[in-house]
């Protein structure tokens, strides 16, 4: 299947996807740009060996049936090539999209023809071929493969409606009566294929959900067909304000293995704060180190204080939401921090978005429940949390950040901006992490590591520029405050 790399892995300006794909993130017309590329077999085996030596498990993801634009285009190009050669049987062997499909849809990213046709037998031939190739690479690397993630997210409405293969399947298979049934048909087939190979199915929350209606309105519930099948799901949608805040707990209570992956607390590609010069997305809110730190895996309602728009929420907001049962707790193997890299163009950008938030994730994943997480008295819980939070910030700022400055060549973690205000005509400043140095200037110039060190309030009329610096002299973003001297 050479088209997977010759077509699917190349990006450039084109009016169709026959030779390569149009770029999603502005990598430009040049095929030699950063938008083009792939890992070779040897590359992937090296990654597996490197990870194994460091006790890291690499879980591959084959995005299906959505987010498959490259695979669909590649196998369509293969089909066209072999049909021109008169090899109809070979051409159809790995086809992922019916040539006469008239379905009309757009993905969230505004793409068309990016969804695999789940009614084509060739779809399963292709996916089994890819699965077997992946297994072989794990064997060659002497690495363990227990599961493969088969996606399941962001499949738009309207897919398959115009597929001749789908309409034929509905006539032949009495269990496939609606478009929703195609979903269960597809993942049922994938689950069976993986079980025969000694693997279990892993995917996004959508693979464990069933669409139905309640009082005439659309309603989603955990799919009982797959519960108890040892299927594992990443559940991202606990967005406070969207209505599905209890979805992770509902799936765990129903028997699914749930990896808590909440966008509200663990999506590290979200911007640290609402500021024009802060990189990152904001569709799921803003995410600084406090949100993964105060996340309580088995009772995250308790410490949720704001909705997606930053509005205050109280415990009353979660009244009526399903809580996690003791049985459900047994179905949560862990929590996960997620960093989507499509807009990150350098290792430094990746490290900036990842650190220091990753330290808070480790605190919640590897440390037993803190006292404030289980304290029933809300006043006592708040006091315990404040004390623990202060201790954590001191440890990060005074011990962990200096380590990160030099460990493995140093990491480009985010140095936070200085907080500044005026009180009685004096300029006062503070910093999120004790241990970082606050430098300032009053001449309008950008602070450097040699500028004045802030230690006490500054009696000042006019602008003051502040910047924080770490132990090796790397600074964060500067801030300016204009003060008016008290009369």
Walk through the language-model features, giving the residues of each.
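Aromatic/hydrophobic pocket-lining residues that form π-stacking "cages" and hydrophobic walls in ligand
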Residues: 47, 58, 190
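An acidic- and aromatic-residue-enriched active-site/binding cleft used to recognize and process polar
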Residues: 1, 9, 56, 61-69, ...
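Aromatic- and acidic-residue-enriched carbohydrate-binding clefts of CAZyme catalytic domains
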Residues: 1-53, 70-119, 158-178
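Structured core elements
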Residues: 57-61, 115-117, 149-151, 202-203, ...
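Active-site neighborhood of glycoside hydrolase catalytic domains
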Residues: 107-232, 237-243, 248-250, 254-255
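Short, compositionally stereotyped local motifs that mark structural "simplifiers"
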Residues: 379-487
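Soluble non-cytosolic domains of exported or imported proteins
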Residues: 38, 42, 117-121, 125, ...
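Flexible, acidic glycine-rich loops studded with aromatic residues
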Residues: 200-425
């Amino acid at each position: 299947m050479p088209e997977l790399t010759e077509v699917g892995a190349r990006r450039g300006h084109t009016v169709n996807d026959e030779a390569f794909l149009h770029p999603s993130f502005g990598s430009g017309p040049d095929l030699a740009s950063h938008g083009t590329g792939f890992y070779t077999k040897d590359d992937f085996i090296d990654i597996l060996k490197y990870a194994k030596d460091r006790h890291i498990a690499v879980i591959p993801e084959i995005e299906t049936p959505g987010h498959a634009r490259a695979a669909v285009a590649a196998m369509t190009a293969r089909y066209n090539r072999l049909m021109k050669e008169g090899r109809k049987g070979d051409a159809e062997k790995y086809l992922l999209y019916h040539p006469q499909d008239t379905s009309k849809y757009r993905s969230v990213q505004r793409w068309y023809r990016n969804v695999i046709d789940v009614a084509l037998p060739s779809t399963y031939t292709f996916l089994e071929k890819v699965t077997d190739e992946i297994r072989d690479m794990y064997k060659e690397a002497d690495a363990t493969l227990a599961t493969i993630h088969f996606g399941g997210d962001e499949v738009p409405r309207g897919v398959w409606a115009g597929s001749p293969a789908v309409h034929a399947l509905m006539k032949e298979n009495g269990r496939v009566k609606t478009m929703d049934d195609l979903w269960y048909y597809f993942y049922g087939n994938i689950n069976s294929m993986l079980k025969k190979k000694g693997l279990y199915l892993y995917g996004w929350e959508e693979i464990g959900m069933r669409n139905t209606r309640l009082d005439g309105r659309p309603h989603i519930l955990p799919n009982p067909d797959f519960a108890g099948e040892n299927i594992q799901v990443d559940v991202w949608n606990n967005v406070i304000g969207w209505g599905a805040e209890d979805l992770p707990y509902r799936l765990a209570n129903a028997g699914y293995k749930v990896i808590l992956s909440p966008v509200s607390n663990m999506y590290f590609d979200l911007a640290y704060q609402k500021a024009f010069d802060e990189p990152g997305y904001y569709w799921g809110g803003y995410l600084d180190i406090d949100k993964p730190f105060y996340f309580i895996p088995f009772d995250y309602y308790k410490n949720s204080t704001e909705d997606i728009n930053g509005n205050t929420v109280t415990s009353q907001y979660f009244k009526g939401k399903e809580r996690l049962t003791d049985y459900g707790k047994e179905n949560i193997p862990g929590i996960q921090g997620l960093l989507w890299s499509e807009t990150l163009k350098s290792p430094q950008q990746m490290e900036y978005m990842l650190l220091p938030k990753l330290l808070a994730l480790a605190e919640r994943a590897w440390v037993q429940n803190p006292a404030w997480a289980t304290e029933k008295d809300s006043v006592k819980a708040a006091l315990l949390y404040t004390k623990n939070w202060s201790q954590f910030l001191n440890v990060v700022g005074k011990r962990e950040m200096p380590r990160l400055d030099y460990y493995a060549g140093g990491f480009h973690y985010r140095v936070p901006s200085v907080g500044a205000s005026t009180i009685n005509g004096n300029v006062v400043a503070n910093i999120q992490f004790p241990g970082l140095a606050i430098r300032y200037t009053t001449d309008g110039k950008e602070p450097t590591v040699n500028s004045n060190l802030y230690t006490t309030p500054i009696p000042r009329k006019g602008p003051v520029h502040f910047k924080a610096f770490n132990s090796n002299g790397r600074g964060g973003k500067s801030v300016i405050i204009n003060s008016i001297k008290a009369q």
